[in-house]
Amino acid sequence: ADYNTAYFAPFTYEDSMYGFPALTGGTCTVVIYDKAMWKEAGYDQFPSTWEDVEKASEYFNGKGITTVAFGNGGKWQANSDFLSTLGNRYTGPDWFMSLVAKNGAAFTDDTFVSALTEMQRLFTDTKIFNEDFNVVTNEDAREYYISGDAAAFIGGNWDESYIWAALKDADEEKFNNMGFAVLPQPADATQAPNSQNIGLGYAVAINSKLADDPEKLAAAIDLAE
């Protein structure tokens, strides 16, 4: 089979698998941007570095437009939709796997602290994001993009699906100008600039109590499949 066995990693412990991945695609961190708005700002595509995004914010702020909309009102979005990717740009995948395996990596390591420092800088020392980012949710922030009050939005693939559906019939021009990009690279990050996170937090597991009831076990497996 062509099934990627790496998908089992989050649900494997000491060579035993405890769940079958139910979500193996999509991303928690996608940049959705209005190509026409960024073209007017002098960019043919969304910038690949935060330095250029910060430069672009001078133009958008002058127009009364938020450069990038983001919502952390639920207090999970900053980690899932931003730091998970930004952190990897500093630490790399080996650090993460070492952390999972409890093999030496720690959140106090210099590379991860650097990621936290950069994230704090981006949200508090620049004017890239909406001022209420820590109050509004991702659902609120994506409306800033839909309404044209923001030139870009960062969220998950579920947000992309919502924006796609909202604009498809309501605003054909804006729908056709939707662009997608990976999270920009920080100036002092040394790991892969195009790295991306993926949602692997869900799995289907069979109740071990069904082992003594073949009929129910077969039904559960059939349902899971």
Language-model regions: role of each:
Residues 1-12, 36-48, 143-144, 151-152, ...:
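Extracytoplasmic "Venus flytrap"/periplasmic binding protein-like
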Residues 1-30, 54, 60, 81, ...:
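Hinge/lid segment of periplasmic solute-binding proteins
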Residues 1-3, 89-114, 167-173, 185-195:
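Short, solvent-exposed loop/beta-turn-alpha elements that line the ligand-binding surface or hinge
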Residues 41, 126, 168-225:
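Extracytoplasmic/periplasmic substrate-recognition and gating elements
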Residues 41-45, 121-136, 149, 172-177:
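A local structural motif
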Residues 48-54, 131-146:
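Short helix-initiation/N-cap motifs at beta->coil->alpha
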Residues 57, 101-133:
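Glycine-centered hinge/linker elements that transmit conformational signals in sensory
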Residues 64-67, 147-155:
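Alpha-to-beta junction loops
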